[in-house]
Swiss-Prot record:
Catalyzes the conversion of GTP to 2,5-diamino-6-ribosylamino-4(3H)-pyrimidinone 5'-phosphate (DARP), formate and pyrophosphate. The lineage of its organism: Bacteria, Pseudomonadati, Pseudomonadota, Gammaproteobacteria, Enterobacterales. Coiled coil: none annotated. GTP binds at R49, V50, H51, S52, E53, Q70, E92, G93, R94, T114, T149, K154. It is an enzyme of class 3 (hydrolase). The gene is ribA. This is GTP cyclohydrolase-2. GO terms for biological process: riboflavin biosynthetic process. InterPro entries: GTP_cyclohydro_II (IPR032677), RibA (IPR000926), RibA-like_sf (IPR036144). The keyword Nucleotide-binding applies. Pfam families: GTP_cyclohydro2. PANTHER family: 3,4-DIHYDROXY-2-BUTANONE 4-PHOSPHATE SYNTHASE, GTP CYCLOHYDROLASE II-RELATED. One of its GO terms (molecular function) is zinc ion binding. Keywords: GTP-binding, Hydrolase, Metal-binding, Nucleotide-binding, Riboflavin biosynthesis, Zinc. It catalyses: GTP + 4 H2O = 2,5-diamino-6-hydroxy-4-(5-phosphoribosylamino)-pyrimidine + formate + 2 phosphate + 3 H(+).
Length: 200
């Protein structure tokens, strides 16, 4: 187990009241958060989203990505379901960090795509470690998940880490002229399962 559960408190949101559970990585002290809605106990699969931190999209309303749109849609879907979990995975910029993400944005402004920009900075296309999220699910006593994601890699890694993903639930929102090339690159080069739905 790479994490420990350290704190929890109620978190009222526009979609309802969640329980915010804080975790800490044993090796680094890095914190991560789960938002739990309703009663997630029992054997029924739980609707869940693993959402990687994106300051620009989640908090600063950036149109360069679909992250903020996905965060809101996931919380809404979970509340409508009546039970579920959102894991807020503190690995900014696909785990290259905020400042390197800004550097990657600058390269994208020069014509590189999101994958090429990471490579120019010496990083893989995706540096995230989703095994931490498997530990978070286990600490919440959740073994079966209906995962809100367009990323097959998340399904594969969580499955390998012992989480039973019984269904992948698409979460396709937020496409706009500012992020269309970014989303097309994620589909073409990173295997994300996206279609050409217009902006919502």
């Amino acid at each position: 187990m790479q994490l420990k559960r350290v704190a929890e408190a109620k978190l009222p949101t526009p979609w309802g009241d969640f329980l915010m559970v804080g975790f800490e990585e044993l090796a680094t002290g890095q914190d991560h958060v789960a938002l739990v809605y309703g009663d997630i106990s029992g054997q029924s699969p739980v609707l869940a989203r693993v959402h990687s931190e994106c300051l620009t999209g989640d908090a600063l309303f950036s149109l360069r990505c679909d992250c903020g749109f996905q965060l809101e849609a996931a919380l809404s879907h979970i509340a409508e379901e009546g039970r579920g979990i959102l894991l807020y995975h503190r690995q900014e910029g696909r785990n290259i960090g905020l400042l390197n993400k800004i550097r990657a944005y600058a390269l994208q402004d020069q014509g590189y795509d999101t994958v090429e920009a990471n490579h120019q900075l010496g990083f893989a296309a995706d540096e995230r470690d989703f095994t931490l999220c498997a530990d978070m699910f286990k600490l919440l006593n959740v073994e079966q998940v209906r995962l809100l994601t367009n990323n097959p890699k998340k399904v594969e890694i969580l499955t390998e880490a012992g989480i039973n993903i019984v269904e992948r639930v698409p979460l396709i929102v937020g496409r706009n002229p500012k992020n269309a090339h970014y989303l097309d690159t994620k589909a073409a080069k990173m295997g994300h399962l996206l279609n050409s739905k217009p902006a919502e």
